């Protein structure tokens, strides 16, 4: 962890993070993790700074040793209905609600917390400052990357396994060529433009 962080006075602290706000396709995926102080997971860091192999290894450790972990999501249709910002907060609420152990306090990556039934705090750059948030970022990233790999098998022409649905030049080219899948976010401008031209 980089900058030091002063933890709140609480016993069961959950970290929450999201992956997938920027892609043009698929769900926004969030995770909540309560780590076990008796069984620490070494090497936690912001998921974006880790190799895929390292993320996968840490995913296995986190899911094995954490006191509790869960995934929450908001689908493309929900993103289109309520916008990506609100959908992300909703997915975070779902992740916290799905925890098998109820946390005393929730630490959320970013600058805004969803409405939760327990105290919470937003931490800017929390995924590189707070172990619980780093763990959540890894769970969310691995989960979403696996979903994109599965989607790639259904629609290999779009290259989802490589770009994970982000608006790369390749993705935009294939979107223009093949049109949108049912999994694309219709409210996002590049997808909307393709649909308007269809």
From Swiss-Prot:
Transmembrane segments: none annotated. Its EC number is 3.1.26.4. Its cofactor is Mn(2+); Mg(2+). Manganese or magnesium. Binds 1 divalent metal ion per monomer in the absence of substrate. May bind a second metal ion after substrate binding. It comes from the Bacteria. The keyword ATP-binding does not apply. Pfam families: RNase_HII. GO terms for biological process: DNA replication, removal of RNA primer; mismatch repair. It is found in: Cytoplasm. Residues 11-198 form the RNase H type-2 domain. PROSITE patterns: RNASE_H_2. GO terms for cellular component: cytoplasm; ribonuclease H2 complex. It is an enzyme of class 3 (hydrolase). GO terms for molecular function: manganese ion binding; RNA binding; RNA-DNA hybrid ribonuclease activity. The keyword Nuclease applies. Its main location: cytoplasm. A divalent metal cation binds at residues 17-18, 109. Belongs to the RNase HII family. NCBIfam families: PRK00015.1-1, PRK00015.1-3, PRK00015.1-4. Endonuclease that specifically degrades the RNA of RNA-DNA hybrids. HAMAP family: RNase_HII_B. This is Ribonuclease HII.
């Amino acid at each position: 962890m980089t900058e030091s962080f002063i933890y709140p006075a609480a016993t069961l602290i959950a970290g929450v993070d999201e992956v997938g706000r920027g892609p043009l396709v698929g769900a926004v995926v969030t995770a909540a993790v309560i780590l076990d102080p008796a069984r620490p997971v070494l090497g936690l860091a912001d998921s974006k700074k880790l190799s895929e192999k390292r993320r996968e290894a840490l995913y296995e450790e986190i899911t094995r040793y954490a006191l509790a972990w869960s995934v929450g999501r908001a689908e493309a249709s929900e993103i289109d209905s309520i916008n990506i910002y609100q959908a992300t907060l909703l997915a975070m609420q779902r992740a916290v609600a799905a925890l098998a152990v109820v946390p005393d306090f929730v630490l959320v990556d970013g600058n805004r917390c969803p409405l939760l039934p327990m105290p919470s705090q937003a931490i800017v750059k929390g995924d590189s400052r707070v172990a619980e948030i780093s763990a959540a970022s890894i769970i969310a990233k691995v989960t979403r990357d696996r979903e994109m790999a599965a989607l790639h098998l259904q629609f290999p022409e779009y290259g989802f396994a490589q770009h994970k649905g982000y608006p790369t030049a390749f993705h935009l080219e294939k979107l223009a060529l093949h049109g949108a899948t049912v999994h694309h976010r219709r409210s996002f401008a590049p997808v909307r433009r393709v649909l308007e031209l269809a």
